[in-house]
Amino acid sequence: FYDLNELSEYINLSAFDDDSLSYGTINGKLNALPTGTNCITFYYNKTMYDRYGLSLPENWSDLINAAEVMKSDEVYPVEMTKKAAYLSSVAYVEQVTGRKMLSDSGEFQYTSEDVRLMLAFYQEMLNKKVTKPAWDFDRNDLEKCLTAGVASWISDAEYYCEPAQKFGFDIVIGDYPKHTQAVSSGWYKKPTSVYAIKKNTKSPEEAAKLLDYLVNGEEMALLQGMGKGVPASKAALEALEARDMLDGIEYKANEKMANSEELEIMSPKLENQGVLDLFISTSE
């Protein structure tokens, strides 16, 4: 891909913070710009937690304790999408051992014991009714009060939470769960999507101007809103803010992520579909 640093005359790179620029930087070259940032986030129906006399969960033990209270009504404290279940298990192993699944170079470095710990953690979540199996995840369960929470990407927040909000439930953003004696956070963030320019383009200036319009342009920002996530570009954010278009559960989740210092940059290899499928099939 084209090094976008070489096209900074046409692209306002100053609209992006260092983390946003790092997503598309490889070996010092800026290959892509993000539209927004994403991470697994826990959304809770505070109305239901209040009814059960429970505080919102801060750690895995809180979720287990909530399950003890809710299971007599066949209610789960939280439901997880497949990706959320997988990344929660990855987070748990890192929190307990301090070891990451991937090295800085992207090499798999879990031991066999780490893999067993990862699978055992998720099995415990299932056995103790903290969450229903990810392969049975139902987006309608939150509004039906069959679950008191959902864990998913920020970009999917409105899809899962808005129906419950329309029923009058107070849906709030929860903490990123941890082990009570965690030695590491274990949670990651990534770009929602990215734009890049082919290295062999015959029209780099025109392509750069188009890219700038897509990520920084006021007109594009207003047309797109938060369709590709809360904008990573400060220019696009300002355009939305000026028109009171920054609101809702997705924006609140994005604000929590932006203000968190515990989230690391996710390697694309952490989302390897083969590893995810193996995790799910083994858990089944």
Language-model regions: role of each:
Residues 158-167, 180-281:
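C-terminal lobe and pocket-closing loops
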Residues 29-30, 71-77, 128-130, 145-149, ...:
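Loop/turn elements at helix/coil->beta-strand transitions in domains of secreted/extracellular proteins
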Residues 47-57, 128, 200-207:
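Short helix-loop capping/hinge motifs at secondary-structure junctions, enriched
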Residues 23-35, 40, 64-108, 123, ...:
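Extracytoplasmic/periplasmic solute-binding protein
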Residues 40-44, 195-197:
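Short glycine- and hydrophobic/aromatic-rich loop-to-beta-strand nucleating segment
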Residues 48-49, 65-69, 138-150, 154:
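Short helices/loops that flank or line small-molecule/ion binding pockets
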Residues 69, 107-135:
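Glycine-centered hinge/linker elements that transmit conformational signals in sensory
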Residues 1-40, 55, 64, 94, ...:
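Hinge/lid segment of periplasmic solute-binding proteins
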